[in-house]
Amino acid sequence: MSQDIHGEKILILDFGSQYTQLIARRVREAHVYCELHPFDMDLDAIRAFGPKGIILSGGPKSVYEEGAPVVEEALFELGIPVLGICYGMQLMSRHFGGRVVPAGKREYGHATLLPCGSPGPLFDEFFVDGKSPVWMSHGDHVEQVPDGFEVVGCSENAPVCAIQDIARDLYGVQFHPEVNHTPRGEQLLDTFVRQICGCTGQWTPGQIIEDAVVRIREQVGSERVILGLSGGVDSSVAAALIQRAIGDQLVCVFVDNGLLRLDEGDQVMRTFAQNMGVNVIRVNAQDRFMTALAGESDPERKRKIIGNLFVEIFEEESANIEDATWLAQGTIYPDVIESAGAKTGKAHNIKSHHNVGGLPEHMKLKLLEPLRELFKDEVRAIGEELGLPHPMVYRHPFPGPGLGVRILGEVKPEYADILRRADAIYIEELYRTGHYDKISQAFAVFLPVKSVGVMGDGRTYEYVIALRAVETKDFMTAGWYPLPYADMAHISGRIINEVKGVNRVVYDISSKPPATIEWE
């Protein structure tokens, strides 16, 4: 291995901001490794981690409130560059004797940052034509900066929006450079980690793959690994990465539950078994799933039936694989963060063991999670580097229960057939018209109600298909995608004419909230 891709790293201390994961993603986009840890990480752990720089996130609290989160005071004496964002800047200011007060006028949303004094190394290229658009989200502000600090930027409503103490490599911004609404924020974070902290940018897809291959080989040795292959992005990239590392020691189990997209099972087999030489066991279990789901209309019970039966079948197949001692999962970094947060209210060490995927204890298999350090966009980049087809790597999210939660009410084989054909037409047209990559998630929904229609000289009484397409950054909130009327009409016409049993198509224009993205 040519270099240690974890040798240069940034520590992000989380004070509860909704944007903290975005900070980490921006640092990774600068090709620098970073980790999220809780704000109260102790000093010995920080020293052991060995960061080249520290970022203090924003947060919902006020620094002058009783019980407000703080860092260990000696953190600022470590000689490591620190960037405080929003709450992080206020915390640093207060620590050094500055004054933080409630803002006379709160700032939420777009603002214009104006330069004050010398910009210094971090802000040298941040201002263009004497200003820089930024995104604010704060109710407090720094009224008086500490000794040794100078003000670099201000706004109409806040006299102190950016500060620096160049001698001690301490910097603070009241705005959020990590969000898209701060156009030059990505550049500012890149400048901090590359120029201020001195990172050289070793965290690249090629280096990540090389490092992962070495680690997988060291972990697994000559033992066998089994992986539940779903056809989704995460399990597909995990399979390709592990296969590169250990070849035919990997055995994938692909369960076709009858609730997949059109020809998805064949596509998975072509990609992995035929083109890449991965050992894939295909289990055709459509009848078992349809029998188990018969008569069930409750969404949560459907999910449990599908999930439990998948585990049951996976265990049956795994028992037939001799000498398998490892179970591989496509766990990614946000899964680790959310799993830790649900248990403790804090993000935990990325290296700590979390059985995110719910491995049954009695299987007694060791867990292999080669993607657990990566965000979704990094997983996609690695998938492309490994040679996976672009449509597979960049396909929209697909729920674990598959079409089982896109068929409202009871699931029947004929309903699934209608839905997968309608969905395939919809997705095909989104690709053809150039909309697919602009949409975060798009899919068709089968409504188990019949409507009256007219075809030829006769009346019809057939099913309804709903089309859904949303735009979102984080899937926590989402807006409906404004598909042009002409494209809607063409898609509707194709579905009605080509899918037997459908005579009406509707378009879902609900946002999240109040609606969810999926219908069930």
Swiss-Prot record:
The keyword Ligase applies. Its EC number is 6.3.5.2. One of its GO terms (cellular component) is cytosol. It catalyses: XMP + L-glutamine + ATP + H2O = GMP + L-glutamate + AMP + diphosphate + 2 H(+). Pathway: Purine metabolism; GMP biosynthesis; GMP from XMP (L-Gln route): step 1/1. Residues 9-202 form the Glutamine amidotransferase type-1 domain. The keyword RNA-binding does not apply. Pfam families: GATase, GMP_synt_C, NAD_synthase. Transmembrane segments: none annotated. Keywords: ATP-binding, Glutamine amidotransferase, GMP biosynthesis, Ligase, Nucleotide-binding, Purine biosynthesis. PROSITE patterns: GATASE_TYPE_1, GMPS_ATP_PPASE. It comes from the Bacteria. One of its GO terms (molecular function) is ATP binding. ATP binds at residues 230-236. Catalyzes the synthesis of GMP from XMP. Homodimer. This is GMP synthase [glutamine-hydrolyzing].
